[in-house]
Amino acid sequence: MQKNYRVLLYYKYTAIENPEKFKDEHLAYCKSQDLLGRILVSSEGINGTLSGTFEQTENYMDYLKSLQGFEDIFFKIDEVDAHAFSKMHVRVKKELVNLSLEDDVNPLEITGKYLEPIEFYQKLQDPNTVVIDARNDYEFDLGHFRGAIKPEIKNFRDLPDWIRENKDQFKDKEILTYCTGGVRCEKFSGWLIKEGFNVAGQLHGGIHNYGTSKDTEGKLWDGKMYVFDERIAVDINKHEHVVVGRDYFTNEPCERYINCGNPECNKQILASEASEEKYLGSCSHACRIHPNNRYVKKHNLTTDFVLQHIASNLETQI
């Protein structure tokens, strides 16, 4: 069945002299094309993902490539049934990705060698290499390369400290690194080199490029890839599907993410529909009884019902 929409994932490190002006012009163009998505702009470049029809996305790619410094930008493209976003945002940030370094890394000056998907696939099977996932823990939990090391981090900016604390795991090895589309690895691999690690390379175009490449078709990837749009998760491995995600409550195989019903928590957890219903869409007892619980409000549950449900159905106060 033909899909009428596309999602574009892209980034480019290139100097932008006036990010605010660039943002305003960019937002105006995106709105003129009825595109939806999220784009970050900084003095160091652009990082975006957006959705639109075939014609709209073609026009956008032509537009961006027509701008000085963006002529060779690499777009990762997914065909989808509908828009993957509900709004259009273009925002200015200090950095495209935040490593919170005292001495920032400029990927235009130092970054790891780009490995095409087939090269990365071959390196994955080399016993002298270790593979570090440069994403957050909840992204890893949904899917990752077989044998990859999981940094226990909630935010990208925590990665350098985690590496320093765990350097014995890979100090004598060649390091491979990867992320969703490549933007985080540009800085992370450069930082690794500056720190003196032996970096074998970074996956060019990220997991997305690896999954769509005819040379690899996602081999040695387990689970799904987390994406920052309304799809939440997409398939990568075209040859087999190994579920690695586990239900937060039951530890059973699960690939369904929800946000905790407590808006002050908002923790992302993997939960089946049955678990979501049983635990009122919340990660803990405190979140279940929170006065602003979104799950409770959405289902018009009374306080008495919530307390009775907890007393009758939950043996432990998870």
Curated annotation (Swiss-Prot):
Query: What species is given as this protein's source?
Result: Acholeplasma laidlawii (strain PG-8A)
Catalytic activity of the protein? uridine(34) in tRNA + AH2 + O2 = 5-hydroxyuridine(34) in tRNA + A + H2O
Check the record and name the SMART domains matching this protein.
Answer: RHOD (SM00450)
Which residues of this protein are catalytic?
C179
Question: Which PROSITE patterns does the entry link to?
Answer: RHODANESE_3 (PS50206)
Task: Output this protein's name.
Answer: tRNA uridine(34) hydroxylase
Query: What PANTHER family would the database entry show?
Result: RHODANESE-LIKE DOMAIN-CONTAINING PROTEIN 7-RELATED (PTHR43268:SF3), THIOSULFATE SULFURTRANSFERASE/RHODANESE-LIKE DOMAIN-CONTAINING PROTEIN 2 (PTHR43268)
NCBIfam families noted in UniProt = PRK00142.1-3
Taxonomic lineage: Bacteria, Bacillati, Mycoplasmatota, Mollicutes, Acholeplasmatales
Q: Which family does it belong to?
A: Belongs to the TrhO family.
UniProt cross-references to HAMAP family, sorted A to Z: TrhO (MF_00469)
Highest rank taxon of the organism: Bacteria
User: From its record, what is one biological process in GO terms?
Assistant: tRNA modification
InterPro entries registered for this protein in UniProt: Rhodanese-like_dom, Rhodanese-like_dom_sf, Rhodanese_C, TrhO, TRHO_N
